[in-house]
Each structure stands twice: as structure tokens, then as C-alpha cells.
């Protein structure tokens, strides 16, 4: 089976304002979806830093509660909006993962209800394609308070600890909910799932 890490994070982002129209409706009340002014390569970038929780899903993790699998998460992102509807980003995400394994697990330690606890470091460096649904369906509005932004991406994931490690290609899917705090500051609630091969924690099968 595939191994999964579910992440929920709050991210604070500093943004560069778009140089498009500020309203999303014309004088007749119709939604405006373009055309948009083309900016230079250095325009419409943002940086974001945040924290949250990781929940690991492996072969034996259904043998313990979700609360026992909660671990801290850290996100750092650099992104660019190519248009108000489409953007890309490079993100580091990870920190820790916790769960249960059997004796074959690379990160097995203390016994727990017939299994072994595992806790290991994890990092995921990934590139994502973002689609701003709010701007796509409702038209660009610089002052919109809430934007819904699904994304998909791929990257390189690493687990390590106990003097061992594993590297895997990771697929990522998730959704961003951004809330406007000011002209150049957003607060984002992000939910994301990372999928890797089952050997990510050294346990195969099940």
C-alpha cells in the first residue's frame, strides 16, 4: 500500500499585489475574467512560512488513535502567480512523523499493544501547480477576503532517523484557503496529502 502523510498547516504569506483591475465586475454587473496586464518576471511573487501537524498513515497505524500519530509540521514556500488564476510554487514541508510499525520497521522503538512505536524525521521538497478557483469562477478581485486554491505537485521526500534513511518520489495534492489580512499579507489554512511508496518507513506489505 502507499504511505500517506496528511498535513494541516497555518501559513503566513507576504504577497506582491497583482497589477490587474481591482474590481471583478463591469458597469453592467458582469464578471470580468480578463484580459490581464502582463507583469515582469519579478512581479507577483510571494513567500510563506507556517506550522501545523502531520498525521502519518502506514500499514499498522489503524491500531492506534489519530492523536498518537500527530507530529509537528513546518512549511516554507516560494511561489509566483503567473495569472490571477494560475500559479506555481516550490515548497519545503515536513519535520516529524509518528505511528506504529512491526519489528521490521527502520524506525521501530518502544513496544505498544503488540506493535512498535515509530518516530522519524521527514522532509518533502516539491513543486506545485495552483489553480485559484475564486478568481477563475468569480473573476479577479484584489480585495476578496477568501480564496480557494486547489493544487497538485510532485517532489522528493526523505525519511531519516536511527542512523538510516529512505528517499522516494512523492505526489502531493491539497487545497489552500487564503484569508486577506492586508494589501500584502495573507493567512492560509492548508490541507495537504503526500503519497510515497510503502517502503518510506522501511515496512513493506500489509
What role is predicted for each listed range?
Residues 34-44, 85, 135-147, 181-184:
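Short loop/turn motifs that connect adjacent beta-strands in outer-membrane beta-barrel proteins
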Residues 51-57, 92-98, 133-135, 154-160, ...:
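Transmembrane beta-strands of outer-membrane beta-barrel pores
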Residues 65-128, 194:
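Glycine- and aromatic-enriched membrane insertion/assembly motifs of diderm outer-membrane
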Residues 46-48, 87-89, 147-151, 186-188:
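Residue-level detector of the transmembrane beta-barrel scaffold of outer-membrane proteins
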Residues 43, 66-74, 121-125, 146, ...:
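Residues that define the transmembrane beta-barrel architecture of outer-membrane proteins
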Residues 59-65, 100-109, 141-143, 161-171, ...:
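Outer-membrane beta-barrel translocator domains and adjoining extracellular loop/strand segments
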Residues 20-79:
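Short glycine/proline- and aromatic-enriched beta-strand/turn motifs that initiate or cap beta-hairpins
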Residues 49-53, 76-80, 127-133, 152-156, ...:
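Residues on the lipid-exposed face of transmembrane beta-strands in outer-membrane beta-barrel proteins
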Amino acid at each position: 500500500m502507499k504511505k500517506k502523510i496528511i498535513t494541516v498547516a497555518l501559513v503566513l504569506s507576504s504577497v506582491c499585489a497583482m497589477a490587474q483591475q481591482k474590481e471583478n465586475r463591469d458597469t453592467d454587473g458582469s464578471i470580468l475574467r480578463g484580459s490581464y496586464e502582463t507583469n515582469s518576471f519579478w512581479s507577483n511573487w510571494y513567500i510563506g512560512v507556517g506550522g501545523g501537524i502531520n498525521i502519518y498513515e502506514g500499514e499498522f497505524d489503524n491500531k492506534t488513535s489519530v492523536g498518537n500519530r500527530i507530529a509537528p509540521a513546518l512549511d516554507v514556500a516560494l511561489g509566483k502567480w503567473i495569472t490571477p488564476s494560475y500559479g506555481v510554487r516550490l515548497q519545503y514541508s515536513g519535520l516529524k512523523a509518528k505511528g506504529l510499525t512491526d519489528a521490521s520497521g527502520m524506525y521501530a522503538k518502544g513496544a505498544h499493544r503488540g506493535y512498535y512505536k515509530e518516530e522519524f524525521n521527514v522532509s518533502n521538497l516539491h513543486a506545485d501547480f495552483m489553480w485559484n478557483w475564486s478568481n477563475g469562477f468569480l473573476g479577479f478581485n484584489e480585495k476578496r477576503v477568501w480564496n480557494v486554491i486547489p493544487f497538485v505537485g510532485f517532489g522528493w521526500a526523505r525519511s531519516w532517523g536511527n542512523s538510516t534513511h529512505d528517499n522516494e518520489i512523492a505526489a502531493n495534492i491539497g487545497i489552500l484557503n487564503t484569508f486577506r489580512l492586508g494589501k500584502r499579507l495573507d493567512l492560509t489554512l492548508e490541507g495537504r496529502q503526500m503519497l510515497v511508496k510503502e517502503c518510506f518507513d522501511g515496512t513493506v506489505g500489509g
